[in-house]
Every structure is written in C-alpha cells, then in structure tokens.
C-alpha cells in the first residue's frame, strides 16, 4: 500500500508540474509541447537486475492513461514515453539521447537509479532539458548551482543512513555493525550517512562488503560479514540482492539486528522471494511526499 501511494504521488506530482507550466497556458511552447500534446520522457529498468522497478514506469503510464481519458491536462494529452535501460548506464545514455534528440520530449521525469542518472546528469544539463523527480536519493541531486536542470525526488540516502545510525546508538550502543552495499554512489552515500551518524562511534562498523550490479549473488559477501562477528547488519541493496541477503542470512544461521534501506522495503519484490519467515524482525523506513 505504501509503495502504491508513493507511485500515485509521483505521477500526480508530474501532472501538477505540467498543469502549472506557464508555456502551456500562454500558447507559446518549448520543444515537446503543442496545442494537442505534451511529451514526457522516462527511463526505468524493465529488464535486467533491477527489473522489479519496472512497475514504476507501468504505474505512471497507467496514471497518465487515466488522465488522458478524462481530457488530459489543460486540454492536452500526455504522451508518456517510457524506455528500458536494463539498469545499464551506457543504455541509459542511449535512451536519453533518443528521448531528447529524436522524440524531442519536454522533459525527463522519474528516471530511476543512481548509476543510471549519473550517466546522463551532465548531458541533460548541457542540453538544458529538465531532468526532474530523479528517482534516486543520491546526495548529488541537491547541487542546484552546478546542475540547475536536475531536481531530485526523495529524501537523500545520507540522511537515511544517519537515521539508522541514531536508532542503533539509542537501542544498542555497543553494536558491532556489518554493512553490505552496492559499489557505486548509491551504496556509498548510505555508508557515509551511517558513518557520519555514528560520529566518533564509527568504529562500531566491524566489516563492509560491496557487490557489483553484475554479480549474480552476494553469498560470498554474506559469509564474510557473518564471520566478522557482527550482531547488527545494514543491508544497502536493491531488491534482487536484498532478497538474497535476507535469505542468505537465514541459511547461514546468522541472526543480527537487520536494517534494510527504504529502496528495498518491498513485500512483493523482496520479502516474498526472500521467504516471509526470513524477513521477520527486519527494520526499515519509508517516506511520503
């Protein structure tokens, strides 16, 4: 239910941005808009290791279908063009160029992923095409001075990491923490947030292990982290690997206090494949906007 509400809020936010666009009201248009339609671009992983997030693109498309059936926005139909990048940065670049240079969209909205959006960050700003509601919480999306055409969406990952750190310090000040994280800006932002939140207690982190998005499993990393003697586990992953980590901990007989980042707090994409019984006691967070 929470995920559905967030998706609806995201789609409604895009619609609100369109309804408030002055160029539509004035009859003077930028590329991607005219009297009949507005082209909105989107890139999500419908395939590949992060395909669980493909539902985001499908949900937004369904929302705009309903909007169009009710007359559109300011009398214009929304042509929502959503392309698959397989969670591969080079493919994201290819798809962004297609949307901007061939489809000539008014803007990109809700494009998903830290490594994928990073790949098109400079390109979108150079082209001066709005890159809005970036669907990732990386800290870099707040650099409006350098990248004025990019706007983030969700609470940043460093802040979320600090929240978990505060919870650990309050509830288990002698914890031994092990961290599994994705080896890119996405994962590293969470690790930094945890370290900053622990402050002079960051020595509580006794082990870290990273994985690449091309890795088939994280079984070796989980065995290493268990072997560290940690009693607290910070699981900084995307759904595929989050499910593996939860299930892997159970198979190893490792029962730490388990913190799971909000990105992977999904029942259908994570808890079901991990085994619901293995997810009992997992601590996570969520947000509404």
Language-model-detected regions and their locations in the chain:
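Glycine- and acidic-residue-enriched helix-capping/strand-helix junction motifs
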Residues: 49-59, 185-189
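Extracellular/periplasmic periplasmic-binding protein-like sensory domains
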Residues: 249-289
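Short, low-complexity disordered leader/linker segments with a strong preference
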Residues: 1-39, 69
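Short helix-capping segments at alpha-helix termini
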Residues: 67-74, 127-129, 198-204, 250-256, ...
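Active-site-proximal beta-strand/loop segments in catalytic clefts of secreted hydrolases
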Residues: 43-46, 83-86, 110-113, 134-137, ...
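Extracellular/periplasmic Venus flytrap/periplasmic-binding protein
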Residues: 91-94, 139-142, 148-253
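Beta-alpha junction/loop-to-helix N-cap segments that form part of ligand/metal-binding clefts
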Residues: 26-28, 37, 52-58, 70-143, ...
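Short beta-strand segments enriched in small/hydrophobic residues
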Residues: 36-55, 176-180
């Amino acid at each position: 239910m929470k995920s559905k509400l967030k998706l609806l809020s995201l789609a409604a936010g895009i619609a609100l941005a369109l309804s408030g666009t002055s160029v539509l009201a004035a009859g003077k248009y930028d590329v991607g808009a005219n009297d009949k339609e507005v082209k909105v671009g989107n890139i999500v992983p419908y395939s590949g290791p992060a395909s669980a997030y493909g539902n985001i693109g499908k949900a937004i498309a369904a929302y705009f279908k309903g909007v169009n059936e009710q007359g559109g926005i300011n009398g214009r139909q929304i042509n929502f063009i959503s392309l698959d990048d397989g969670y591969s940065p080079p493919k994201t670049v290819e798809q962004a160029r297609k949307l901007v240079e061939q489809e000539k969209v008014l803007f990109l909205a809700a494009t998903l992923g830290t490594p994928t959006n990073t790949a098109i960050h400079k390109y979108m700003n150079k082209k001066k095409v709005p890159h809005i509601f970036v669907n990732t919480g990386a800290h870099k999306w707040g650099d409006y001075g350098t990248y004025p055409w990019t706007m983030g969406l969700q609470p940043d990952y460093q802040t979320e990491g600090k929240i978990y750190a505060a919870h650990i310090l309050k509830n288990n000040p002698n914890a031994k923490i092990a961290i599994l994280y994705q080896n890119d800006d996405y994962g590293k932002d969470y690790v930094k947030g945890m370290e900053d939140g622990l402050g002079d207690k960051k020595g509580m982190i006794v082990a870290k292990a990273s994985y690449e998005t091309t890795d088939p499993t994280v079984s070796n990393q989980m065995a290493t982290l268990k072997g560290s003697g940690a009693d607290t586990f910070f699981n900084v992953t995307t759904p595929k690997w989050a499910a593996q980590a939860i299930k892997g901990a159970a198979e190893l007989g490792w029962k730490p206090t388990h913190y799971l980042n909000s990105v992977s707090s999904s029942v259908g994409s994570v808890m079901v494949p991990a085994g619901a019984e293995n997810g009992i006691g997992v601590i996570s967070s969520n947000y509404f906007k």
